[in-house]
């Protein structure tokens, strides 16, 4: 199926290598946080729908930070997919998948990256025409060994593992041929965001990018 996505899931994955998973409670933090991450070399940003401010945060970044590739996380149904697209998201990431969500993603205007944690779920997503997936929760679902094993029968499928990813293990994931990027929350610690310590966040981003460049 040909999808009418403005930005493909392949484009999103290739702009990695690290995707910060952002839980932003106050919209006033949205723009400076996005700019701090971009200053550190990270353009792909995932704003999770875990706070009441999430849609406003996405809208603010989409409007005021044109260099950002802004997406929404924790998208679990077709209604939310439509809402984040209307807010300006360029892609949506789900922790799982349903038939309704996969169908809505195929018909929508932004890239949908479904979540899987098993081969059966992966095969279901492939049946709907998807090739790029979130592997979640990564560490709890077998981690590096699990993704490596999945790559055997499905060598053309790409993953972005999220869940338990940290500065101490993200390079292990990125070294796998079927992993294009990794998602993590360590790039924007709550205390740094609340304090407006944007220099610290920029430095964390620079460190993550530099580490990945060595692979």
From Swiss-Prot:
<comment type="pathway">
    <text>Carbohydrate acid metabolism; 2-dehydro-3-deoxy-D-gluconate degradation; D-glyceraldehyde 3-phosphate and pyruvate from 2-dehydro-3-deoxy-D-gluconate: step 2/2.</text>
</comment>
<feature type="active site" description="Schiff-base intermediate with substrate">
    <location>
        <position position="134"/>
    </location>
</feature>
<keyword id="KW-0456">Lyase</keyword>
<feature type="binding site" description="covalent">
    <location>
        <position position="134"/>
    </location>
    <ligand>
        <name>pyruvate</name>
    </ligand>
</feature>
<comment type="function">
    <text>Involved in the degradation of glucose via the Entner-Doudoroff pathway. Catalyzes the reversible, stereospecific retro-aldol cleavage of 2-keto-3-deoxy-6-phosphogluconate (KDPG) to pyruvate and D-glyceraldehyde-3-phosphate. Involved in the degradation of 3,6-anhydro-L-galactose (L-AnG), which is the major monomeric sugar of red macroalgae. The cleavage of KDPG to glyceraldehyde 3-phosphate and pyruvate is the sixth step of this pathway.</text>
</comment>
<comment type="subunit">
    <text>Homotrimer.</text>
</comment>
<comment type="similarity">
    <text>Belongs to the KHG/KDPG aldolase family.</text>
</comment>
<dbReference type="GO" id="GO:0008675">
    <property type="term" value="F:2-dehydro-3-deoxy-phosphogluconate aldolase activity"/>
</dbReference>
<dbReference type="InterPro" id="IPR031338">
    <property type="entry name" value="KDPG/KHG_AS_2"/>
</dbReference>
<dbReference type="Pfam" id="PF01081">
    <property type="entry name" value="Aldolase"/>
</dbReference>
<protein>
    <recommendedName>
        <fullName>2-dehydro-3-deoxy-phosphogluconate aldolase</fullName>
        <ecNumber>4.1.2.14</ecNumber>
    </recommendedName>
</protein>
<feature type="active site" description="Proton acceptor">
    <location>
        <position position="46"/>
    </location>
</feature>
<dbReference type="InterPro" id="IPR000887">
    <property type="entry name" value="Aldlse_KDPG_KHG"/>
</dbReference>
<dbReference type="InterPro" id="IPR013785">
    <property type="entry name" value="Aldolase_TIM"/>
</dbReference>
<dbReference type="InterPro" id="IPR031337">
    <property type="entry name" value="KDPG/KHG_AS_1"/>
</dbReference>
<feature type="binding site">
    <location>
        <position position="74"/>
    </location>
    <ligand>
        <name>pyruvate</name>
    </ligand>
</feature>
<feature type="site" description="Plays a major role in determining the stereoselectivity">
    <location>
        <position position="162"/>
    </location>
</feature>
<keyword id="KW-0119">Carbohydrate metabolism</keyword>
<keyword id="KW-0704">Schiff base</keyword>
<feature type="binding site">
    <location>
        <position position="50"/>
    </location>
    <ligand>
        <name>pyruvate</name>
    </ligand>
</feature>
